Every structure is written in structure tokens, then in C-alpha cells.
Amino acid sequence: MSKQVEKIKELIAKREQARLGGGEKAIEKQHARGKYTARERIDMLLDEGSFEEVDMFKLHRCTNFGMEKKQFLGDGVVAGSGTIDGRLVYVFAQDFTVNGGSLSETMAEKICKVMDLGMKMGAPVIGINDSGGARIQEGINALGGYAEIFERNILASGVIPQISDIFGPCAGGAVYSPALTDFTLMMENTSYMFLTGPKVVKSVTGEDVDQESLGGASVHSTKSGVTHFTASTEEEAIQMIKTLISYIPQNNMEEAPRVECSDPINRMEDSLNEILPDDPNKAYDMYKVITAVVDDGEFFEVQPKFAKNIIVGFARFNGQSVGIVANQPSCYAGVLDVNASRKGARFVRFCDAFNIPIVSLVDVPGFLPGTGQEYNAVILHGAQLLYAYGEATVPKVTVTLRKSYGGSHIVMGCKQLRTDMNYAWPNAEIAVMGASGAVAVLYAKEAKGAEDPKAFMAEKEQEYSDLFANPYQAAKYGYIDDVIEPRNTRFRICRGLAQLACKKQNLPAKKHGCMPM
């Protein structure tokens, strides 16, 4: 046997060793938890045979606490590039079978390498997190590794899409990387995120709480809004990531992939002509409007369990990827509040950063009143949504279906925020406030002296409605470009987006804006 053949056999053996991660027993434990290994997850995510691994043989350099005896090839993270539906992506997956997936200086170097490559090549970076946190034995070097990753998250923001999958624990400083990325997905029952764990919470505050209640997928998908998606199985999670990737571009210099569309752009949807209740205060389901107008009724929702009074997500019109922002009248009448404003603003800014047109479907009676909202800075959060719409230079199309009152009218993509196409249905009520509220302010004194105050106020409400509670007053001043028949909504949106395909709009030169936080 020649030396070259011996070397090749040695290489093959080392590769096999590296692929075992922490060893067969550790892999069995991972499977016993109902979880896949890092390599299995990457294999499910990427096109078959497309994965190109880097730093397979890298080892940590720590000698503290006997760590020199705990060496595993790759040091607990699998990293490299591959394709999803033929499109280049960079990926890293922490390997819980190696030292609990704890982050070392070496692991951070591997993660940073693929992040740098993603920036250089203009391709999305997908991180699969399953880690016990910083490798304590390495001390400050592990913390420095986190900081290196965070800096790259920041530099890559708005340049390439960044997606975080939480498939296990993610605690302490480790949570900041997913928080800095564009989208986060958490596994139900097997993943959690928090800065301080239950034991620390107990020792500091005396509060008894378990991991799931403190930072599980349910908490972060419904209460905090930290995560955008949840999945019950890893297969489902991987498929969600693939679907998400299909709607977004490779980087901020490109557009999202356009797909072939067999759904006619001039398809009339007669059901929309009767979808609004006769009573303007009665709810209806905005999802029915969305699925009626988008290509083939397909809508990929983002943060579906958080701030349900506003709906955001991706769809297509004539094969073109768009971001949908819509008020939901069946949840709190579609009012805007702190969480809805945060959710909407973040999504609008992502779409603008990555050249995805924004279609807004408006039915909003105002902002939610109350001390709870004011104490939680609804002013600042509402201003975030206003800022996001006003800053966005992508094509913007707004359709007002029914109510659009006061400040909420402005922040939901009004004409003065440089929205390109503003349409309204005939039922639209575009005004400072609703008729009853306006009349209560305008005629309070006169009503007291009226022979029949109720009849007097009813008459004045009707007068106000006739004057303001319609789309024609706004159309008269050019704030609405056209009043359209509801069943024509899909066609008008498609045609509007086609007109705006070559839109170019520049902002004043600046280092960056100071968005209210």
C-alpha cells in the first residue's frame, strides 16, 4: 500500500470520526430526546448532495479544567454552504452531542467564517441553535466569541437575510444572536430562550418558574414576540424555513425570485363585494380578503400568534413576492396597540430592506386607549410603525376596506407617507374619527338644549357620516387615487405593482435615521 493510499484512508477515517460528533452514545441520547443531530438537520434543510462543509477538523485550544482531553473534530458546530431549491445559502448547526453544544472560541470562529462568506457572496445565513450556552471552561474567550458573532449579525442586518432556528436550549448571552436576526423559529416543547434561567430567577426574585413558562416557544410566540414561527416537529420547522426562503431575495441588491403564475391577474372575486357587514361595527375575517386576492390563495404568515389584531406575512401577486400588512377586525376590532405597532414596523422594515413591495389592507378604528398602553409607550411604538412606512422606498400599495380613522389612518400607509397607490372600497370611512365620537365633541352643548337629544345626535351623526364617512372626501383631495369595486381588488393591486416595477426613490443622505425605540 502506497503512502498516498494510507493518507487517503486516514482522511476517510477522520471524516467518519468527525461525522459522529460526540459519539454514537451521545447521538442515541439526542435521538431519545426526539431530536435530530446537527448533520441530520442540515441534510433535511439543504438540497441533496449540495452541502460543502468548512472546518470539519477544527479543534478547540482550551487546556483549562482538563479540556485538552475533551477534543472532538469540528468542536461542536457543523458549518458550510449548500443550496435550497438551487439557491446558495450558508448554514451552521450547533451539535449538542459535543460538550452540550457549548460555544467555544473555536466554534465562534467557524460560525463567523460562514457569516463572513455569506456577506461576501450575498447569500442568506441560517443558524440552527442547540446549545447549553458559553463554554465556561474558556471564560472570557467564549464571551469574546459571542461578541464576534453579534457584530457580524449587526453588520449583515439589511444586507443578507439571517434566519435563526432554535432547536434546543438558547440561554444567557446566546439569545442575542437570534434576536439580531431577521426571523426566529422555535420548536414547541424542546426549545427555550431566556437571559437568566429558572434557578437564577428563583434566587434573585423568589419566583418559581419552569423553563417552558419562562422562555418556551409558547411564551415567545404569543407574549413577547421574540419568535416569528413555531413548529411541533423538526420536519415541519425545516419546511417552514424552506418556504420562507422562497419568498425572500438572496441579498439587498436583488429581488425575491419570481415564480410562474397561473392565477389570472384579472380574476374577479365576487365574494368580496359582500364580505363587509352592513353594521360598520361588526367584525369580519381579514384572512378571507387576503386569500381571495393573492396568487392561488397562498399566504405565509409571520408571527401568527402574536398581536393578532394585525396580520403580516408573505404572498405573491402575479408571481411577485410581496409583504402583506393588514388590520384584523375580528381581533380587538383591528385597533393598533403597542405589540401590533412593533410587529408591523419590524415587518415593513424587513420588506423595505430587501426590495419586497408592501401591500397594506386597512380597516383600523384607531389606537387602543388606556393607561396600560400609555405606560408601555404606545406613542413611541406607534411612531415606529409610522417611521417604517415613511422610510420605506419599495413599491407601496394601500387599500382601505372600511375604517381608517385619525392617527391610525396615517401610520397604515397613507398617501402623505409616499405610498404609491392608494385605493379605497366604496364602504371606506376615512376621517379624523368615527361619526359618534365626532358628533359627541362637536354638538355636546347643542344636544343638551335639544328637545330630543337622542334624535338630535342621530341626525348629526348621519350628517357627519354623509360628509366624511366615505372615500370620496379623501378622493376629492387626491389622498385616494381611486375608489374601486371590491371584487376588482386583486386586479388593481397586480396592475399597480406592475406600474411600480421600476420605481426608484432616494432618501436624503444620512448616516442612519434615529427611529423611535
Where do the language-model regions lie?
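Ligand-binding clefts of soluble mixed alpha/beta catalytic domains
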Residues: 1-517
